[in-house]
């Protein structure tokens, strides 16, 4: 039987689940809060049921402080980020991405920021740190807040400091596909007392789940811990594939993070460096094996940073060639993904003229991106198979044959 390897997965052992259960009876959220404060060296920390809710709480807090209404984010990122912006009564404004760094393009950001910009949302895409110094300098010129989206970059660093700590406020995600997963969950960190005060008001208004709902989340977390392991993923694949999101989210629920999840998160964080190091090692291996090859682009990494690859991004010069390699890689049992098939301005009607594409890089990127899993259930042998498929395809001239 050929074992399948999922595109995402955090190794949550039965011991971690047991520790999570024990912690959940001992104010585990407070313990996890202390852990995150220590990791980020931040004074304030708040948990919610998702990164989306964390972002929403931040935006609601900033609205209490400022009358500005525009929120700038990259045109290629999670489309779900639009939902909390609109729900908070704010206006999303997009800027293009860089085909060099795969992150927000600084020149494009400079063109769309103005006196009505409430905040800039730099996203560390794929666990690749963005140039936060450049972002902060631009924000300071306009007295604009910076909300640092470190949802996919937990464990990554810039100048030995973790991503998520450079903006006025930052947030992380513990969702299924993130670097450290407790099924779902989000976390806010800040040192800004004014922002923290307003976040506290929003946070305390979040509802707490009843016992049945908490038990369901615990059961789903345990099921996920089993399902992401290659053997069980293979056995359960038909059922699991039906549960994967294929439709666009139109809303989101907000509530308090559960004690059991906080307990598991606390247990996981004690061994987080092993998980982060695996992701880095796997990404570094792919980078070394694929750099310099004609027909593909790899991200230019920020100097003095460490990327903890959420997944490893490869940009192909040709869309049809990417599709062929995507199928070949998945036929080996290793689940590569294409992430978001369209940039945000082609998903939601935000008033942009699509005939004159205002964000050509984001559109180009969405059509040619392929992501390779880097989580701890991967290994060098599996990664070498992927490298061979890509190199063989490039050496055969297949990518040239499909060029238009």
Predicted features, each with a name:
Residues 1-66, 88, 274, 284, ...:
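Conserved PLP-binding active-site segment in aminotransferase class I/II-type PLP enzymes
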Residues 35, 205-208, 273-299, 324-332:
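Conserved PLP-dependent catalytic core of the aminotransferase class-I/II
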Residues 58-113, 121, 329:
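Conserved PLP-anchoring active-site segment centered on the Schiff-base-forming lysine
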Residues 100-198, 371:
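Active-site phosphate-binding strand-loop segment of PLP-dependent enzymes
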Residues 171-183, 201-212, 221-225, 256:
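Active-site PLP-lysine loop of aminotransferase-like
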Residues 173, 309-318, 348-355, 367-379:
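Conserved PLP-binding active-site segment of the aspartate aminotransferase-like
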Residues 209-217, 285-288, 303, 322-358, ...:
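Conserved PLP cofactor-binding pocket of PLP-dependent enzymes
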Residues 253-269, 280-287, 298-315:
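Conserved glycine-rich beta-strand-loop-beta hairpin in the small C-terminal domain of fold type I
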């Amino acid at each position: 039987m050929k074992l399948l390897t999922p595109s995402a997965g955090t190794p949550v052992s039965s011991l971690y689940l047991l520790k999570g259960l024990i912690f959940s009876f001992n104010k585990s959220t407070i313990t996890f809060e202390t852990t995150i404060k220590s990791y980020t060296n931040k004074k304030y920390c708040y948990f919610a049921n998702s990164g989306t809710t964390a972002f929403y709480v931040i935006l609601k807090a900033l609205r209490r402080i400022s009358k500005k209404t525009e929120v700038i984010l990259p045109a290629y990122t999670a489309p779900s980020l639009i939902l909390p912006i609109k729900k908070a009564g704010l206006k999303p404004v997009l800027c293009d991405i860089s085909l060099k760094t795969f992150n927000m393009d600084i020149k494009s950001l400079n063109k769309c920021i103005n006196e009505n910009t409430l905040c800039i949302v730099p996203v560390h895409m794929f666990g690749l740190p963005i140039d936060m110094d450049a972002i902060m300098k631009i924000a300071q010129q306009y007295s604009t807040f910076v909300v640092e989206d470190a949802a996919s970059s937990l464990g990554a660093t810039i100048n030995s400091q973790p991503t998520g700590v450079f903006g006025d406020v930052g947030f992380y995600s513990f969702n299924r596909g993130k670097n450290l997963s407790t099924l779902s969950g989000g976390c806010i960190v800040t040192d800004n007392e004014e922002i923290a005060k307003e976040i506290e008001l929003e946070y305390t208004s979040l509802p707490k789940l009843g016992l049945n709902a908490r038990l369901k989340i615990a059961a789903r977390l345990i099921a996920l811990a089993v399902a992401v392991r290659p053997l069980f993923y293979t056995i359960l694949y038909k059922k699991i594939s039906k549960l994967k999101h294929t439709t666009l989210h139109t809303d989101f629920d907000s509530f308090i993070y559960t004690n059991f999840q906080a307990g598991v998160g606390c247990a996981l964080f004690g061994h987080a460096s092993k998980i982060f190091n695996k992701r880095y090692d796997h990404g570094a291996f792919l980078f070394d094996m694929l750099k310099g090859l004609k027909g593909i682009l790899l991200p230019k990494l920020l100097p003095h940073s460490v990327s903890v690859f959420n997944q490893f991004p490869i940009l192909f010069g040709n869309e049809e060639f990417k599709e062929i390699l995507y199928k070949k890689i998945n036929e080996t049992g290793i689940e590569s993904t294409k992430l978001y098939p369209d940039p945000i301005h082609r998903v939601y009607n935000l008033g942009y003229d699509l005939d004159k594409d205002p964000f050509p890089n984001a559109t180009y990127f969405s059509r040619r991106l392929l992501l390779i899993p880097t989580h701890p259930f991967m290994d060098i042998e599996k990664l070498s198979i992927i490298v061979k498929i890509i190199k063989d395809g490039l050496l055969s001239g297949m990518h040239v044959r499909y060029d238009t």
